């Protein structure tokens, strides 16, 4: 647990350092670039957690995880984006916070698998 917290702290401080140039974006496009970087980091963590968890699951668990993930993606897209006649819009703050929450959910399920055994019923 101490190693995990240290790794989390190092990642957070490294991430904060990398994003320090984004603290005061000069214009909206710089701000969008910075928000996208944060989203990409969250999405990478989500995908890493998904793969780690899937590797621990039996066939039924993998199917439940896949179904749950596809449902989550659909909900995220519906909540954080919209399309109208003038274009397609994504609320990156919504997408990022939703992705971080899902990554944490997957990490929690992975920890359960490694400590007390995988519970497929908790994957939904």
Predicted regions, residues:
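Short, linear, compositionally biased motifs with a strong N-terminal bias
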Residues: 10-11, 83
């Amino acid at each position: 647990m101490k190693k995990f917290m240290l790794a989390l702290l190092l990642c957070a401080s490294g991430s904060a350092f990398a994003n320090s140039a984004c603290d005061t974006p000069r214009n909206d496009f710089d701000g969008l670039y910075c928000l996208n970087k944060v989203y990409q980091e969250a999405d990478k963590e989500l995908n890493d957690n998904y793969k780690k968890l899937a590797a621990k699951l039996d066939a039924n668990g993998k199917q439940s995880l896949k179904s749950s993930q596809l449902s989550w993606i659909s909900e995220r897209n519906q909540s954080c984006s919209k399309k109208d006649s003038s274009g397609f819009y994504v609320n990156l703050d919504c997408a990022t916070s939703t992705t971080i929450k899902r990554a944490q959910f997957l990490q929690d399920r992975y920890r359960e698998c490694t400590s007390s055994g995988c519970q497929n019923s908790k994957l939904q």
